[in-house]
Amino acid sequence: MQNRSDCRKKPLNIYEIHFGSFRKPSDKADDWYNYEEMIDILIPYLVKNGYNYLEIMPLNEYPCDESWGYQATGFFSPTSRYGTADQLKAFVDVCHKHGIGVLMDFVPVHFAVDSYGLANYDGTSLFEYPNSAVGVSEWGSCNFMHSRGETRSFLQSCANYWISEFHMDGIRMDAISRAIYWQGDPARGVNLNAVEFLQYMNQGLKGMHPSVILAAEDST
């Protein structure tokens, strides 16, 4: 933690990767290097090329390889594709020792429809909209209903978990325009509940972690 990179002292030079695609042991679809193996593969590359931040596409557990982690089922679970939680912690720690901060993509807008995830969690639409007109995203996933206290608490707790437990230096929130505007369409108007959620999220995380980097994707 003491050796983590500090974006306030120098310009950010960010390298973004999908962990399972940077380099593979073989051409097999389900053959990946684990978190610890990537220490000697990825970190020297970042140092050599002068990167001081690594942005990793979602590391939460997800069922479909093709989604690259953007349709999550296990928001509090590092994907086992690349090893254990302790191995991920070791990877982040070595990044910090080399002056490289670690940012993680986080998806607070939608989640996978699989029954073993959040969909219909308690037999009701606890986290998602009951109305399919706004409840289903363009990717066929469930949109989070950001007006609900359960949703806000869950997502902020999840982001705090990754920062606190894995020492992530920042969170990049994905597809935010799909939350701010109904179904991502400015012509349909602003979703004020989603705007309030983002304010709640940012204020809460900054209160707990003043130096954390909070970024968002706006694809309007």
Segments (PLM) and residue ranges:
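Substrate-binding/active-site clefts of carbohydrate-active enzymes
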Residues: 2-12, 18-168, 172-190
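Conserved alpha/beta catalytic core and glycan-binding cleft of carbohydrate-active enzymes
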Residues: 167-169, 181-220
